[in-house]
């Protein structure tokens, strides 16, 4: 029996979920799928400039797991940029904590609010 997936915590659902090269019709594009937690890892490490340990803590994963997530994300983004592929952001094993809810016990899951103690 496989292990149940562990949730990765993200600040919010992405507002933009599709990126494509200009001048190439959608019908001719290959896609790379970037998960929501991979996008969050890129946001925390590369955009916010946080240390890997802090990023892992915020996503509630171990440092080795964070390293695997960020490595996968960077590889997918590099593939899309170098090879002219579209990037679709979707899926993953994540829950949304929301900036105003961090540390308050209540977290928003993709399907509504719940308490950490539940």
From Swiss-Prot:
Residues passing through the membrane, by range: none
Family annotation (InterPro entries): RNA_pol_sigma_r3/r4-like, UPF0251, WH-like_DNA-bd_sf
Domain of life: Bacteria
Pfam families attached to this UniProt entry: DUF134
Family of this protein: Belongs to the UPF0251 family.
Xref: HAMAP family: UPF0251 (MF_00674)
UniProt-recorded name of the protein: UPF0251 protein TTE1845
Native source species: Caldanaerobacter subterraneus subsp. tengcongensis (strain DSM 15242 / JCM 11007 / NBRC 100824 / MB4)
């Amino acid at each position: 029996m496989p292990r149940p997936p562990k949730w990765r915590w993200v600040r919010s659902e992405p507002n933009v979920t599709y990126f494509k090269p200009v001048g190439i019709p959608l019908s001719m594009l290959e896609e790379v799928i970037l998960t929501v937690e991979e996008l969050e890892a890129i946001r925390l490490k590369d955009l916010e400039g946080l240390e890997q340990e802090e990023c892992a803590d915020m996503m509630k994963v171990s440092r080795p797991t964070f390293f695997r997530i960020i490595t996968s994300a960077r590889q997918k983004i590099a593939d899309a940029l170098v090879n002219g592929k579209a990037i679709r952001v979707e899926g993953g094993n994540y829950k949304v904590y929301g900036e105003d809810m961090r540390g308050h016990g209540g977290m928003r899951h993709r399907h509504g609010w719940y308490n950490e103690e539940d």
